[in-house]
Amino acid sequence: MSDLQASTAAGQRGPADHSIRDQIIEAADEHFSRYGYGKTTVADLAKTIGFSKAYIYKFFESKQAIGEAICARCLGTVTTAVRESLAQGKSATDKLRRLLKTIAVSTTEIAFNDQKIYEIAAYSCAEKWASSTNYLEEISGIIADIITEGRASGEFERKTPIDEAVRAIMLAFQPFMNPVMLQYNLEAVPEGVNEVTGLILRSLAP
């Protein structure tokens, strides 16, 4: 199980594969999409789904736990898109370009297609939910692997400690991967993404 998959269990109760759990998540996803995460209570969800609050609490310990499950699923679509794109990469340089572009485009699509669900992603980043922190750890791990590959092939410099290089790349790309920051940088996609990517690659050059 990946870190991102593990994060979906945060605050959940009962069998992980229980159909009722999925039903609650689906209904909550739809409700949050319509009314927003911040304005919704567990009582609202219970009324919408037709369950009692007590029954929902058998599967989730809080509204945040439900939000975590939705957020993890949402961020999971981003990492899936990233890995599918990386599978087509021809070099470490190409893979890093693909990684950063896919993250920016996928996150932007979420922002445009479902603003209310995007709100949950923003909550997760601002409040450092497990679904968000594990997502960032997974992306950091992918970047570390790409840097290692690039150093082995002679594409990237070898002086900077890998963990330092990864942190720097993650910090530089925050405006396009952090939902809280991206909402203020939507007009910079894709030109700004390409410029930041170019700057990152030049810093990695031997």
Over which residues does each language-model region extend?
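N-terminal intrinsically disordered/low-complexity leader segments
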Residues: 1-19
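Amphipathic C-terminal alpha-helical segment
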Residues: 3, 105-109, 140, 144-145, ...
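Helix-turn-helix
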Residues: 23, 27, 31-65, 69
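Short coil/turn segments at alpha/beta junctions that flank glycine-rich nucleotide-binding fingerprints
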Residues: 34-38, 88-89, 110, 153
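Hydrophobic alpha-helical connector segments
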Residues: 69, 73, 82-109, 162, ...
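Amphipathic alpha-helical packing segments from all-alpha helical-bundle domains
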Residues: 76-79, 126-153, 163-167, 191
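Secondary-structure edge/capping motif, primarily at the C-terminal ends of alpha-helices
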Residues: 85, 114-121, 180-183
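Short secondary-structure transition hinges
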Residues: 102-144
